[in-house]
Amino acid sequence: MAFTNYSSLNRAQLTFEYLHTNSTTHEFLFGALAELVDNARDADATRIDIYAERREDLRGGFMLCFLDDGAGMDPSDAASVIQFGKSAKRTPESTQIGQYGNGLKSGSMRIGKDFILFTKKEDTMTCLFLSRTFHEEEGIDEVIVPLPTWNARTREPITDNVEKFAIETELVYKYSPFHTEEQVMNQFMKIPGNSGTLVIIFNLKLMDNGEPELDIISNPKDIQMAETSPEGTKPERRSFRAYAAVLYIDPRMRIFIHGHKVQTKRLSCCLYKPRMYKYTSSRFKTRAEQEVKKAEHVARIAEEKAREAESKARTLEVRMGGDLTRDSRVMLRQVQNTAITLRREADVKKRIKDAKQRALKEPKELNFVFGVNIEHRDLDGMFIYNCSRLIKMYEKVGPQLEGGMACGGVVGVVDVPYLVLEPTHNKQDFADAKEYRHLLRAMGEHLAQYWKDIAIAQRGIIKFWDEFGYLSANWNQPPSSELRFKRRRAMEIPTTIQCDLCLKWRTLPFQLSSVETDYPDTWVCSMNPDPEQDRCEASEQKQKVPLGTLKKDPKTQEEKQKQLTEKIRQQQEKLEALQKTTPIRSQADLKKLPLEVTTRPIEEPVRRPQRPRSPPLPAVIKNAPSRPPSIQTPRPSTQLRKTSVISLPKPPTTAARGETSTSRLLQPTEAPRKPANPPIKTVPRPTPPVHTPPLSLIPSSKSLREVPAQKAIKTPVVKKPEPPVKQSVATSGRKRSLAVSDEEEAEEEAEKRRERCKRGKLAVKEEKKEANELSDSAGEDHPAELRKAQKDKGLHVEVRVNREWYTGRVTAVEVGKNAVRWKVKFDYVPTDTTPRDRWVEKGSEDVRLMKPPSPEHQSPDTQQEGGEEEEAMVARQAVALPEPSTSDGLPIEPDTTATSPSHETIDLLVQILRNCLRYFLPPSFPISKKELSVMNSEELISFPLKEYFKQYEVGLQNLCHSYQSRADSRAKASEESLRTSEKKLRETEEKLQKLRTNIVALLQKVQEDIDINTDDELDAYIEDLITKGD
């Protein structure tokens, strides 16, 4: 269908109310001002002036102006400014700050109601006027932006429509502060040179007391936040001069506020004992994955276009046949050239896609720089930049979160590129919160290492700060202003200043006379006392920062025990929370629920299965209290251990409660049998409080304590043919130890809990709409149907959204009374307006299955992820078999009809596993081969395979590194030997040539008529003389 046919269709409209809505993204007012400074920096400006002009007739009493000498804009560039979201800077390799095409509009509208922009480029002068006042007074709902243009030399209008130009200038004269053409031209004349931009914001926003939010009166050299107390507020939160000084990690643009230069800083040059740490991680993949998906999408479209053009060229060539007329050849040549061009473009797009796919697997490297702020020790924390622009400041990490003196006064600096972390629209945070927390955690670890490396704590923290003049016990008090302390601080941190002409940074040598010297705003290289750096032509010297290394200390047994105790406490809190749940049997019970409670607890473990945890470490098992020998019974060698499930029985009768006063016991069976009816989950009547072990601490005996919870807990239990014993004896020493999970698994667990909490709040609203579909029983859904529906997880499907089909994967399944719903997470979403996931009904017209890709077309990460999901599903199905339902906790006879593998097969598999583990056992593994040889199947189930694989890979890598280093040393030795031999060869050839020259000279003295021109002639002549002599 031709594009012209779309002219009658509806289009998205941008109302002028969106101007205000868009501006609310800037909670931090200085962030809005920084957006306009960023635009000047991206335009390669060397200077920007920020100043206020008094205009009492305007709201706020003054206009705020931003004048730079950057590249400026021509009319087409200025027209793209008013297109929200359009940016020419959005490339993965871009080092420019602007990426979203929104900063000028959102920043200016946050400061005031109206702004007018004057820009010059080459021979054009363009004015852009965006006014909410104009829209309000004219009653216009859509956004209208006048954009008149003049010739820079003749000042004549540049337009094809004189009437349109007249309307645009009339609006500018009526609603802007400049009411005549002369006043408008005067603004253009303020722009120095042939290019630059002037942005004027007026009708500023006011506070509740009628005063503007920006204070330009208290300090004539600064722009401050109105009504902000200096006490307890960081300088950058109160003073725009202080904020602009650290806004860029490597400032290359001069910033003037009210005509006074901002002394910009390179933070790494302002710290005591700076040290750099290189950090490499493969966790930062979100932005890179987005770029890969975009590149794949673009490459696929380019490939389709190229194939279509090639097909068209072949068809035309066949159809023309023997037609050799000139017009036919020209037409054929044009089609073929188009096909060749499109094929080249497709090849380029494919190479870009392949490069991005390779880059996705490469670990990202960041440089952490830490140092001590001895000038203001209370101003400490992490400064995190993105593409050299400050995003977060004073972020506390690691030991600083504890609030003590450890790591106090330390400042960290890191510059994160776009491909690692992407900032939010207001550039005050990062879009991916999970990866940002991972970055902070890594900086915390390196901060602790830096604190050890500089050894301040070993010398004494108080003594260290006393040396630099911090004599007060109050941490926030400034240092002493005595001259000796000022000199002491100045000796440790050399002065680094920027030249006003070449914009290069120069480090000045220390001089006692310059301790209290204030350098002028127009400092230049010729004022440098260093003779090697006293001219602008001299190259800039890089700061020499020592390189540090992160050394991870192994955890002590005490730390492991402490983490284990904390894990047990958390599990007990979960158990207590589960005991407080109430069943839902009718709509009356549903109405009694608080709003944040979901009414689908039964589907919860099926819809969101927990990721299997790591098994406990054998070292922890050995340190656990052993079972008393008096109650141990010999274990038959042929006894087969099986896993069973704790299921919840019906409420006990009075007689049964008398028999089990503190808890009800279940006797596990040899083989699991399916109950006749699915168990209805209820809460038992109140019983006296009892100390209950956590869910994962299940005694490995025949008597098991039932957990009175709303959810059916599925936990593998090891059975032994021991006679029943008293509860107090059975629980005395048989608690299984928990393995301490690593930090990343704990973080993922916390993420899942928060996500479930959010989904729980939404589930209540959905349940109220579907309340009429609830039955009187909470357990109507059959578990078999639920398990069958869960097999749909991981399916690759296509979903239709807004008449477009998008590929994705089923991540969750919800079984209703009448239908099954899939939650599909999309692989690639082209715009921010399309959701990243969506609930669809299975079998509807908006969803269809997609043929799964073959293994060779999947990336290693995809194959690994799919393998993990498949293993997790198999494990869940193996554990999810229900146990025979028992009444009132009475023991039942084991089912001997169930099929089971032979004991010899089990023992053979255990022996094979032991042999494999012994064969590949790492050298420094805590479990020896001797201990491994006597492990039984229960201990092998708890074997720490994750740590085993990790140490094996480390050992293998060390072995490879040793071979590599040995090969490298041999190669270096061979290269050195080769260079020596080549040197000797050259020396010998030079001696031979010199000898031949002397022989020729000697022969010419003896016989003047000898004519020898080449070395071969000389050799032949000498050989002939020797032959004649003989």
Swiss-Prot record:
EC main group: hydrolase
Reactions performed catalytically: ATP + H2O = ADP + phosphate + H(+)
Residue(s) carrying N-acetylalanine: A2
Cross-link (Glycyl lysine isopeptide (Lys-Gly) (interchain with G-Cter in SUMO2)): K650, K702, K714, K765, K817, K930
Post-translational modification: Phosphorylated by PAK1 at Ser-737 upon DNA damage. Phosphorylation is required for ATPase activity and recruitment to damaged chromatin.
EC number: 3.6.1.-
Residue positions binding ATP: N39, S87, A88, K89, Q99, Y100, G101, N102, G103, L104, K105, K427
Biased composition (Basic and acidic residues): 532-543, 550-577, 763-772, 779-791, 837-849
Keyword set, alphabetical order: Acetylation, ATP-binding, Chromosome, Coiled coil, Cytoplasm, Hydrolase, Isopeptide bond, Magnesium, Metal-binding, Nucleotide-binding, Nucleus, Phosphoprotein, Ubl conjugation, Zinc, Zinc-finger
Residues binding Mg(2+): N39
Positions in coiled-coil regions: 285-362, 555-583, 738-775, 966-1011
Biased composition (Low complexity): 693-702
Subcellular location: Nucleus; Cytoplasm, Cytosol; Chromosome; Nucleus matrix
Pfam families: Chromo_MORC2_6th, HATPase_c_3, Morc6_S5, zf-CW
Lineage top rank: taxon: Eukaryota
GO MF assignments: ATP binding; ATP hydrolysis activity; chromatin binding; histone binding; magnesium ion binding; protein homodimerization activity; zinc ion binding
Regulation of its function: ATPase activity is dependent of phosphorylation by PAK1 and presence of DNA.
Chain positions covered by the region annotation Disordered: 530-791, 837-874, 882-901
Record's compositionally biased regions (Polar residues): 629-646, 856-865
Name this polypeptide is given: ATPase MORC2A
UniProt organism field: Mus musculus (Mouse)
Native organism taxonomy: Eukaryota, Metazoa, Chordata, Craniata, Vertebrata
